[in-house]
Curated annotation (Swiss-Prot):
This is Holliday junction branch migration complex subunit RuvB. The gene is ruvB. The RuvA-RuvB-RuvC complex processes Holliday junction (HJ) DNA during genetic recombination and DNA repair, while the RuvA-RuvB complex plays an important role in the rescue of blocked DNA replication forks via replication fork reversal (RFR). RuvA specifically binds to HJ cruciform DNA, conferring on it an open structure. The RuvB hexamer acts as an ATP-dependent pump, pulling dsDNA into and through the RuvAB complex. RuvB forms 2 homohexamers on either side of HJ DNA bound by 1 or 2 RuvA tetramers; 4 subunits per hexamer contact DNA at a time. Its EC number is 3.6.4.-. Its main location: cytoplasm. It is an enzyme of class 3 (hydrolase). Has 3 domains, the large (RuvB-L) and small ATPase (RuvB-S) domains and the C-terminal head (RuvB-H) domain. The head domain binds DNA, while the ATPase domains jointly bind ATP, ADP or are empty depending on the state of the subunit in the translocation cycle. During a single DNA translocation step the structure of each domain remains the same, but their relative positions change. Homohexamer. Forms an RuvA(8)-RuvB(12)-Holliday junction (HJ) complex. HJ DNA is sandwiched between 2 RuvA tetramers; dsDNA enters through RuvA and exits via RuvB. An RuvB hexamer assembles on each DNA strand where it exits the tetramer. Each RuvB hexamer is contacted by two RuvA subunits (via domain III) on 2 adjacent RuvB subunits; this complex drives branch migration. In the full resolvosome a probable DNA-RuvA(4)-RuvB(12)-RuvC(2) complex forms which resolves the HJ.
């Protein structure tokens, strides 16, 4: 669906985000805002590895897009004082592609694989001995005379990032020494991120203006920085460049981002469930067909925040809009919905 490419409040990396993300990226754990428990545990692991003079144990980062998985990987490399090699699951098509990357790593280097859940099983199998034994097994020859040759690899750290933790195979998950989930940020943390970014970009913003952006950022730093940039442009053209509360609210209203950070596509998902399917429950594939979207995109991009807000429920029968969703959209909640939910509960569904 082409709309997703232009979606302002998507956590996915857009083409014009890369340069901005790099300029705003913190360079050490102490500058990384939010995710306190993750930071504390990761900081201990980094310090311990440095004190022992070892490579950091393999790290898996998972959670919705835009929460800082790539940023954390760069911070880990900087904190460890090592090089980082960046690639992605879809970019590694064959075993030979991964073998070429692994054999070019230097001692203690970091290999960052984004979307690691998209590695094929054949390629994934190359990682098992590489992660566990720092070795690469290659087949020499063909047919009955083929034999396995083991090449030693330098000790390195694999950092995997994924939005689909459940899609990782158990053997791959088990080989990560540290597994961290990144959660949506609370409004105070997003406020601090917007404030920091505004300072770096030289943008003048009042406290209420920062709050207006933060509350619409879906708990996602990438979205917060993107909205800040759009509001900055609006304030420059329509005002004197100062982001006030009214200026931010006016700008975001023009961009069709409501007070909770929902856009027209979020509204479309919820209204489709409510109006076309009686509020649900309805299957994911059915919703996808109704709004001309891929089921995976709905599950990865739209659902996490709607679930976080309590606007959507996943039930054994499918997706269901909650009373909160009706209230937010100013749609009367049907009286018979409570009775239906009671019957489902009695039936154990």
């Amino acid at each position: 669906m082409s709309e997703e490419k232009e979606r302002l409040i998507s956590g996915k990396l857009a083409a014009d985000d890369a340069k901005l993300d790099t300029s705003l990226r913190p360079r050490c754990l102490s500058d990384f805002i939010g995710q306190k428990r993750l930071k504390d545990n990761l900081g201990v692991a980094i310090q311990a590895a440095k004190q022992r003079g070892e490579a950091l144990d393999h790290v898996l980062l998972y959670g919705p897009p835009g929460l800082g998985k790539t940023t954390l990987s760069h911070i880990i490399a900087l904190e460890m004082g090592v090089n980082i090699r960046i690639t992605s699951g879809p970019a590694i098509e064959r075993q030979g592609d991964l073998a070429a990357i692994l054999t070019n790593l230097k001692p203690f280097d970091i290999l960052f694989i984004d979307e690691i859940h998209r590695l094929s099983r054949n390629v994934e199998e190359v990682l098992y001995p590489a992660m566990e034994d720092y070795a690469l097994d290659i087949m020499v020859g063909k047919g009955p005379g083929a034999r396995s040759l083991r090449l030693k690899l330098p000790h390195f750290t694999l950092i995997g990032a994924t939005t689909r933790y459940a899609m990782l195979s158990a053997p791959l998950r088990d080989r990560f020494g540290s597994i961290f989930r990144l959660d949506f940020y609370d409004e105070d943390a997003i406020h601090d991120i917007v404030s920091r970014s505004a300072h770096i970009l030289g943008v003048e913003a009042e406290e209420n203006g920062i709050r207006q952006i933060a509350c619409r950022s879906r708990g996602t730093p990438r979205v917060a920085n993107r909205l800040l940039r759009r509001v900055r442009d609006y304030a420059q053209v329509k005002g004197n460049g100062l982001i006030t509360g009214d200026m931010a609210a006016e700008s975001l209203a023009c961009l069709e981002v409501d007070r909770l950070g929902l856009d027209e596509i979020d509204h479309k998902v919820l209204k489709t469930i409510i109006h076309k399917f009686g509020g649900g429950p309805v299957g994911l594939e059915t919703i996808a067909a109704a709004i001309s979207e891929e089921a995976d995109t709905i599950m990865d991009v739209y659902e996490p925040y709607l679930l976080q807000l309590g606007f959507l429920e996943r039930t054994p029968r499918g997706r269901q809009a909650t009373r909160l969703a009706y209230q937010h959209l100013n749609i009367p909640y049907p009286a018979d919905k409570n009775n239906q939910q009671g019957l489902w509960a009695e039936n154990g569904t």
